[in-house]
């Protein structure tokens, strides 16, 4: 998370790759620059923004050490997700940029609950249009997170999907998806990718998705034809 930079003699924070330093959203000058860049793209005619890990732009200002889980690494998520000023920053973004253009906005929000989602994607339009949440994707998580061959228990998946449908009803908007570039293929994970059942599994998964309330997302992941990734 913390990387030493020899040129400046200082450490910088990166929640992901060391080539991706986290921006300091506490700094109003940084926010100004971000909003200026967004405005530039809006004036070029973009249709919207998919905001990567937007729930992580506000950190616990004390920067406490994360709990060591399974002797592997510190868990930063309680201190970087849904931080104390995240909604304040998004409302500022909305007022200064998003509300001035005809856009669609979706925020990738790791660690989000339905209660938090009601703020991010509230129907009064003060922040974003919708969120990408991960609770249904985490029903098989184990010691190594999503890196497992464990098949999901559909009872758990159904319970999570029902919760998001019911809790957001009339209060916020959700996105609908089964996989993406960070997740295993849906047919391999939630269905059966054998030659006999691959097609019917895909139809079953698609039917389930499109009968729910929300905006469906269908991604075409660049993988060699005929290669089915089980993880």
Where are these regions (language model features)?
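Active-site and adjacent substrate-binding regions of carbohydrate-active enzymes
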Residues: 1-231
């Amino acid at each position: 998370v913390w990387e030493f930079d020899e040129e400046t003699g200082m450490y910088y924070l990166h929640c992901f790759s060391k080539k991706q330093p986290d921006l300091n959203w506490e700094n109003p000058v940084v926010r100004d620059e971000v909003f200026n860049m967004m405005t530039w793209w809006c004036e070029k005619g973009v249709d919207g923004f998919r905001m990567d890990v937007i729930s992580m732009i506000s950190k616990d200002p004390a920067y406490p050490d994360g709990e060591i889980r399974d002797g592997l690494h510190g868990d930063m998520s309680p201190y970087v997700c849904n931080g104390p000023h995240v909604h304040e920053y998004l409302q500022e973004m909305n007022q200064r940029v998003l509300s001035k253009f005809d856009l669609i906005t979706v925020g990738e929000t790791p660690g989000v609950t339905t209660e938090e989602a009601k703020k991010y994607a509230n129907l009064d339009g003060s922040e974003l249009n919708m969120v990408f949440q991960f609770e249904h994707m985490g029903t098989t998580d184990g010691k190594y997170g999503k890196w497992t061959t464990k098949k999901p228990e559909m009872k758990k998946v159904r319970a999570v999907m029902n919760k998001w449908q019911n809790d957001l009803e009339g209060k916020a908007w959700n996105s609908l998806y089964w996989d993406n570039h960070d997740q295993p293929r849906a047919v391999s994970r939630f269905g059966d990718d054998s030659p006999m059942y691959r097609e019917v599994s895909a139809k079953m998964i698609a039917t389930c998705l499109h009968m729910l309330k929300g905006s469906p997302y269908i991604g075409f992941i660049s993988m060699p034809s005929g290669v089915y990734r089980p993880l």
